[in-house]
């Protein structure tokens, strides 16, 4: 049991205090086998029509600025077959726009929220100064992107 549980890829995810930026946050989730694990959950994965889910997501204290350190080798130095640690059931439906028209699209498991679902996840708080997002073109005007 211990080898099966601990002999997995590891991701250490830097988390910054949530100051309203869009992005995924650290949450405990329960998979289809009823097992709890730490995951990075994106807003598109949350049923915002469900008042309690929306409240939990909206009140999250931290989010992931995509600062990750990963270990992809086993304790004996062999590379993991990373496809063995994907949760292929973690796809979700999201709204996108194509040529100014709203459409719904199925997203397959993303890197944080499916492809790394069965990794060992460790979340650590990092200073906000390490986060300089580019989610929109206006973010390029922020202090962290100005060199003059």
Region roles according to the model:
Residues 1-148:
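OB-fold and OB-like single-stranded nucleic-acid-recognition modules
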